[in-house]
Amino acid sequence: MTNRSQDKHILVNRDALIDGTIVSVLVTGSAITLYKGYTCYLKQLTNASQIPTKVFRRKWLYGKVTSVGDGDNFHFFHMPGGVLGGWGWIRAVPKLTKNEKKTASLSFHWGTNKLKQQNATYKNKRNLPTISVRACGIDAPECAHFGNPAQPYSEDALIWLRHRILGKKLWIKPLKTDQYGRCVASIRIWTWLGYSDICLEMIKEGLAVVYEGKTGAEFDGREGKYRRHEFIARAKKKGLWSQKRLQTPGEYKKRYQ
């Protein structure tokens, strides 16, 4: 083989090596980019402990409510990216069973204190990879538990919240994780009039009071608004404010702790 042929052969091998290296770098770079994109935007969070610190107070999470435990907490199935993230066509979304049972609850359609037959559209679905969420800035009447009696309007608050959000998709903004491992969060659901604050709705209907704790309260900057509407609901004797001898959820907890 002549020197010229040898040089040409070396150049071809060198070019092939360079091309292979470039392709390898591009593939590796693309894989890293895809992985970072997935972990940042499309990775599902399955409990409150998995929520990154950078998300608290800054970002909204999208998902579906799969169960409602009482008047101020529920389980949230995180669906990052929504439809664009593959949910409903590549990634499975939990389907809830329709609830045919009619239950009496406080009417909220006409802003009265009259009881009406109202259907919680779906039944709770448990044992799913969900985030336990505690509504921020409010306290709903306590349901019966650990042998303690239920507070008046606790069942109304529970049924109202189930009717309002169970089986529906909404947004939460994580604010902190409480001592029970729940994500304390601000909550928004889409309506024809725009996004609605679920916590504020409950205060307006007299189905929750502004959170009474002296420390650790979270309002996402809306404490003043919550207190104004609590004052209005109280003046109108809406919901729990219609009682002659009112015991707030905070007072109830102190009594039975």
Swiss-Prot record:
Ca(2+) binds at residue 139. Coiled coil: none annotated. Keywords: Calcium, Endonuclease, Hydrolase, Membrane, Metal-binding, Mitochondrion, Nuclease, Transmembrane, Transmembrane helix. The chain crosses the membrane at residues 17-34. The active site is at 134, 142, 182. It is a single-pass membrane protein. Pfam families: SNase (PF00565). Its EC number is 3.1.-.-. Disulfide bonds: none annotated. Its main location: mitochondrion. It is found in: Mitochondrion; Membrane. GO terms for molecular function: endonuclease activity; metal ion binding. GO terms for cellular component: membrane; mitochondrion. It is an enzyme of class 3 (hydrolase). Signal peptide: none annotated. Residues 59-243 form the TNase-like domain. PANTHER family: EBNA2 BINDING PROTEIN P100 (PTHR12302), SERINE_THREONINE-PROTEIN KINASE 31 (PTHR12302:SF3). Belongs to the LCL3 family. This is Probable endonuclease LCL3.
